[in-house]
Amino acid sequence: MANYNVYFSPTGTTERVVKHMGESFGSMENIDLSRRDMKNHEMEQGDFCIVGVPSFGGRVPGIATERLRKIKGDRTPAFLLVTYGGRAYEDTLVELKDVFEAQGFVCIGAAAIVAEHSIAHQIEAGRPSAQDYDELDTFAAEVKERLKGNACPVEVPGNRPYKEYKVLPMDIQVSDECMGCGSCVESCPVGAIPFEDPKMTNGEVCISCMRCVEVCPQSARSGNPEKVQMISEKLKMICQPDKANEFF
């Protein structure tokens, strides 16, 4: 029997949440969906898997869906986890469930965890909080009990067909602080930054995941300030503060 943490986590939040959940289940192997060199994986019926993704506009990020299809289960129990920046996760959980069930997994639990927005950081700033992690610990205990029996597949909210998947171009900008170290080139989940010119970003390939901004040691990369401001103002109007996590 083996336990796995599976995550797509451009800015690190989803990875932290998944790994925190995994601490309740002992030793875990990690599978990082953001790696372009990700290998195929096969899991057995006696294994257990926690899979987490951020919600991108109410959907599973497209590249995460592609890489989840490299993982095969054999009626392997799985826990689904979605992080979102305080607006809504819409069809993300149900899409994640559909994708993973099609790969041979039985989804015995799920959670939608509120997190600091990866672009408009003032939205749900500081989350997940200590209280959020306490809630996750409490639910992890319930999931452990479910694993002892013949747990039924969980139902999660969302619509089929899913809402249209859209990528909001962030027009990533690079300042003169860039040293050409290549951290962004290596880390980009979709290979949108050319090695020979790391100050460039291929806007047709970029998924606006903000990973390059997060990993830059010089803080030289940023989203277009006008677009960041526009997103921030819109979210301030539509997001309710201190949104509750949801567990299923």
PLM regions: where:
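FMN-binding flavodoxin-like domain, especially the glycine-rich phosphate-binding loop
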Residues: 2-17, 21-169, 225-248
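Short hydrophobic alpha-helical module
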Residues: 139-146, 181, 187-191
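Charge-patterned, long linear interaction tracts outside catalytic cores
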Residues: 164-186
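Iron-sulfur cluster-binding cysteine motifs and their immediate structural context
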Residues: 174, 183-207, 211-228
